[in-house]
C-alpha cells in the first residue's frame, strides 16, 4: 500500500484549517504544513490536529513555499491542498481505496477539483491542480 503526505502552505487560516485537516486525517499518513507568517492561531491548530508545522518566511513565491513543503514530506506520494479545501466523505473513501490499489509505477494521479459555488450556480469542475504524485516539484509560470 502506498503512503500519502498531505502538503499545505498556509497563512492566517485559523478560521478554516480545522475543517480541512479533519477531512484528510482519515487517509493521510502525514500532514505537512508550511506556515508563511500567520499572526493568528493557525500553527497551534495544525499541531493540535497532528500536523508537522514548519515556519518559512514568505518570499512572494508560491512555488518555493510549496517545494519546501514537498521537501519535508517522507511518504511515497504528496497531495497538496489549500486550507479552505474540503474533501467529501465519499472522496475520502476513494482516497483510502486508491492507497490500497494504486500500482506503485504510477507517478501522478490527477483528480477532479470542484470550486466552491453559490447554491444557485452550477459547480465548476477542473481536471487539474489536486495531484497526488511521487516527489512532485512545482514550478510557477511567470
Where are these regions (language model features)?
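A conserved acidic beta->alpha catalytic loop
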Residues: 23, 35-47, 58, 82
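Extreme N-terminal starter segment of soluble prokaryotic enzymes
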Residues: 1-5
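Short, well-formed alpha-helical segments that are part of the catalytic scaffolds
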Residues: 8-30
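Conserved beta-strand positions in the Rossmann-like core of class I SAM-dependent methyltransferases
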Residues: 32-35, 54
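Catalytic-site signature of metal-activated, phosphate-bearing donor transferases
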Residues: 64-70, 76, 88-142
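Acidic metal-phosphate-binding loop of nucleotide-sugar-dependent transferases
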Residues: 60, 77, 81-88
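Conserved donor nucleotide-binding strand/loop of the catalytic core
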Residues: 43-68, 72
Amino acid at each position: 500500500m502506498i503512503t500519502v503526505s498531505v502538503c499545505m502552505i498556509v497563512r492566517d487560516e485559523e478560521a478554516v484549517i480545522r475543517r480541512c485537516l479533519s477531512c484528510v486525517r482519515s487517509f493521510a499518513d502525514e500532514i505537512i504544513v508550511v506556515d508563511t507568517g500567520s499572526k493568528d492561531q493557525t500553527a497551534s491548530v495544525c499541531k493540535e490536529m497532528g500536523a508537522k508545522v514548519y515556519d518559512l518566511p514568505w518570499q512572494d513565491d508560491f512555488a518555493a513555499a510549496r517545494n519546501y513543503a514537498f521537501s519535508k514530506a517522507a511518504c511515497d506520494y504528496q497531495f497538496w491542498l489549500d486550507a479552505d479545501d474540503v474533501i467529501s466523505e465519499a472522496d475520502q473513501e476513494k482516497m483510502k481505496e486508491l492507497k490500497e490499489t494504486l500500482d506503485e509505477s504510477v507517478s501522478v494521479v490527477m483528480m477532479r477539483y470542484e470550486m466552491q459555488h453559490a447554491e444557485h450556480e452550477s459547480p465548476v469542475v477542473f481536471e487539474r491542480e489536486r495531484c497526488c504524485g511521487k516527489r512532485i516539484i512545482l514550478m510557477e509560470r511567470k
